[in-house]
Structure formats: structure tokens, C-alpha cells
Amino acid sequence: MVVITEHIEARTKQFETVPEAEAQGAIMMTWLTNQLADDTRPRLEKRGITDLDPTGWYNFQTFLDVMSEIVKSKQNVSMTLVAVGKGVVENLPLEDFPSIEAFQAFVENLHGASVRNMPETESHVVIQEDSNIYIVNNTPVSNDLMYGFWWEMLRLYSIGGIKYRPIPHQDYPSNEVGTIFLLQPEKR
């Protein structure tokens, strides 16, 4: 079994980042437009965010605080955060990945392309082990949000012509640090 600590030097705490970390507006727009935006939009509005510029950069901790608030509310937590994650995919210009190497490059650059000024320890990692593909979430982003993101992306796009589904594999609770997702090939 894949053990997260074998692949990551320092585990990132969920919902915490450095003060200078900023998130790209195009990614964060999902908080205002996702399927359950009636729940997420007011949480941003009370923090003074009513509109987002897709080309702008915003304090990343604000969005982590909203995620944390949703988790602490204990109301529709998974459903809300999965909806936000799925909504992110709508804002990205993606296409099928021709190979696992292309997918791995995308995954490993994803967090760094959408968040700047972050600690080097924050990342997503793809591991190929025992004929399986795993994604490690070592970011402060909710595991439920990342599950929604991977679910929607892999629903729409294939890797090397194969469709996959993310399966929570290890350390999954949404209020814990990091997790591992197993990418399971769809049965035809």
C-alpha cells in the first residue's frame, strides 16, 4: 500500500498556508458559480468578495478559511466542497491527456500554476506503483474539494485513451491533512 509519508518530506496542514500565498481568480471563480454557490457565495461576500477577476490574484488564505468554515459548519460539507471542486474544471481549458506522463506533468504543476508564493512543500504528486496510479494531495485544499475536481476532470478527459475514476484511498477525511486517491480504470 502507498504510504503518503514515503512520498512527501513535509505534510501540509489543511486550511493553512503562508500569508503571501495568492490564488488565481480563474480557479477561485468557482466559489461564486458552482452548483451550490448559494451556500458558498455568501461566505465570500461576508469577507468583502462579491466578484472575481479571472486574471487577478487573491489572498489564498481567504479561500482556505471559507473551506474550513464549511467543514466546521458540519452541514452539507462533502456535497458543497465536491461541487466547488467540480466547478473548477469548468474554468480550465483542458483536453484528453495523451499519456500518463502528460497527466503527471499537469498534476504536478497544477497547484503551482494556480497558487503563487506558496511553500515548496505544497504539491500534488502522481505515483505509479504496483500497476496503479495514485494522486497525493499535499496541499492545504480540502480533500473533498480535490475529490470533486479529480472526479469531474476524469469524467470528462481520458489519460492515454483510458477513462479513470478517483477513489479515496488513504487518509481521506475532509478535516485531515492530505490524502491519496487511487485512479481506477473504468470497466468497459
Where are these regions (language model features)?
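Conserved short hydrophobic interaction patches
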Residues: F149-Y157
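Short terminal or interdomain "cap/linker" segment that borders an active site or interface and mediates
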Residues: V2, V115-N143, Y157-R188
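Hydrophobic (often cysteine-bearing) scaffold residues that line and stabilize catalytic clefts
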Residues: M146
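Terminal low-complexity, intrinsically disordered regions
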Residues: M1-K74
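Generic signature of intrinsically disordered, low-complexity segments enriched in small/polar residues
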Residues: V18, M29-T30, N34, Q61-V66, ...
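Amphipathic interaction/junction segments at domain boundaries or subunit interfaces
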Residues: R47-N143
